[in-house]
């Protein structure tokens, strides 16, 4: 029996007027998931706790059975691990965005038009030409508009704020120390210099000149956020006795899995957006499940989250329908415990994560089937699982896999 957590990233939402006051999930045609819901058990989940807006990083740590309040140091180290950038003790790592700024350094597009090519050339300039007071700069492009920055040197601290303003129409935030240490003050100054230099180096780069000529937003500034040092995470297999693998599109999710000691699968053509090669994603998910190499599989598809951040109502709904085609192959598998969920809600009206609980369902042999017939936020709230937390998920899955021990005599 295999355990599978299938995360449709950012799927949860709120009723949308344009969809007849339904959510994108409720409005989507999802016959495969509806069938599994009819034969399974449903509920809603607060990944962290009610009202807390989870990051994708803290949400996935929780789903894998870790307490993010204990092991989470910041997003950066996980992003770095996901693209094989080493973070040594003493280093600090950041998740970065390739973004667009105008001549006054006002951020006009935090994701530089969802840039998909040319970032390797921009990263090369950053690595070769940024100079920061005896601090080594290691910068690497990730998928799409994402990148990773590692700073290496003496006297660095992760007790600093972000440069990313999180919303367009603002200048990059001035990075500030979070304590009175000289290390934090020094590091904040270093990161501010990095942001300034990134703009000067990238604004006239040939990649960006070409993008402007093509009517595309230039990727002319780097915005670091989510700083963290190396986290201390007990390997997943050591904790739970399950050999695990992660099939995901983005570096963040693969990085979390790698730091947890799990194997990862790279998917050709996967972008982490609604334009991803869904057929390739489909193939690699199904092939991994059928491989019989693993006891536990974490799956993440990211397009619904991207659409939520962009406020793309119909793009989000349509992507959910594409994911349902993948589910059609899982529907008839008998030897799996399948837990389908979102890691958080990303309402199109908010264009960011929210604290709304997410809909979940379980497909497994011998379940106590409830009366819910379709997959949606409000339907799932009537299900037999009731309202659970992310910390409950692995307990439930492992119990249904029959690999747990009795608590007590």
Swiss-Prot record:
Enzyme Commission code: 5.4.2.12
InterPro entries reported in the protein's UniProt record: Alkaline_phosphatase_core_sf, ApgAM_prokaryotes, Metalloenzyme, Pglycerate_mutase_ApgM
Residues spanning the membrane: none
Reaction(s) this enzyme catalyzes, per UniProt: (2R)-2-phosphoglycerate = (2R)-3-phosphoglycerate
Classification via Gene3D superfamilies: Alkaline Phosphatase, subunit A (3.40.720.10)
Record region (Disordered): 160-179
GO biological process: glycolytic process
Molecular-function GO terms, alphabetical: metal ion binding; phosphoglycerate mutase activity
Domain of life: Archaea
Keyword annotations: Glycolysis, Isomerase
Pathway linked to the protein: Carbohydrate degradation; glycolysis; pyruvate from D-glyceraldehyde 3-phosphate: step 3/5
Function: Catalyzes the interconversion of 2-phosphoglycerate and 3-phosphoglycerate.
Family statement drawn from the similarity comment of this UniProt entry: Belongs to the BPG-independent phosphoglycerate mutase family. A-PGAM subfamily.
HAMAP family: ApgM_A
Descriptive protein name: 2,3-bisphosphoglycerate-independent phosphoglycerate mutase
Source organism per UniProt: Methanosphaera stadtmanae (strain ATCC 43021 / DSM 3091 / JCM 11832 / MCB-3)
Organism phylogeny: Archaea, Methanobacteriati, Methanobacteriota, Methanomada group, Methanobacteria
Name of the gene this protein is made from: apgM
């Amino acid at each position: 029996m295999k355990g599978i957590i299938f995360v449709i990233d950012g799927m949860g939402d709120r009723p949308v007027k344009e969809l007849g006051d339904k959510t994108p999930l409720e409005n989507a045609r999802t016959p495969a998931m509806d069938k599994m819901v009819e034969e399974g058990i449903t509920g809603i989940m607060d990944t962290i706790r009610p009202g807390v807006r989870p990051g994708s990083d803290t949400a996935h740590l929780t789903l894998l059975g870790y307490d993010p309040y204990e092991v989470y140091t910041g997003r950066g180290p996980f992003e770095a691990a996901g693209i094989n950038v080493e973070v040594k003790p003493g280093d600090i790592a950041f998740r970065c965005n390739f973004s667009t700024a105008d001549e006054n350094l006002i951020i006009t597009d935090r994701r530089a038009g969802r840039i998909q090519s040319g970032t390797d050339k921009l990263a090369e300039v950053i690595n070769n030409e940024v100079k920061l007071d005896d601090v080594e700069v290691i910068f690497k492009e990730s998928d799409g508009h994402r990148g990773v920055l590692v700073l290496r040197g003496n006297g660095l601290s992760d007790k600093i704020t972000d440069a990313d303003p999180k919303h367009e129409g603002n200048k990059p935030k001035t990075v500030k120390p979070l304590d009175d240490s000289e290390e934090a003050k020094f590091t904040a100054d270093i990161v501010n210099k990095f942001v300034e230099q990134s703009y000067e180096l990238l604004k006239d780069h040939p990649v960006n000149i070409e993008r402007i000529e093509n009517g595309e937003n230039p990727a002319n500034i780097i915005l670091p956020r989510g700083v963290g040092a190396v986290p201390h995470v007990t390997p997943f297999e050591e904790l739970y006795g399950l050999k695990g693998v992660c099939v995901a599109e983005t570096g963040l999710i693969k990085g979390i899995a790698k730091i947890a000691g799990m194997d990862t699968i790279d998917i050709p053509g996967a972008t982490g957006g609604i334009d991803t090669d869904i057929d390739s994603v489909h193939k690699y998910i199904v092939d991994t499940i059928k491989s019989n190499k693993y006891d536990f599989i974490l799956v993440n598809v990211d397009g619904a989250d991207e659409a939520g951040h962009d406020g793309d109502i119909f793009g989000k709904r349509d992507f959910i329908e594409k994911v349902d085609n993948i589910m059609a192959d899982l529907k008839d598998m008998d030897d799996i415990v399948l837990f389908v969920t979102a890691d958080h809600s990303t309402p199109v009206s908010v264009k960011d994560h929210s604290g709304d609980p997410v809909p979940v369902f379980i497909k497994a042999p011998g379940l106590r089937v409830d009366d819910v017939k379709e997959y949606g936020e409000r339907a799932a709230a009537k299900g037999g699982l009731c309202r659970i937390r992310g910390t409950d998920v692995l307990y439930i899955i492992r119990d249904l896999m029959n690999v747990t021990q009795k608590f007590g005599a």
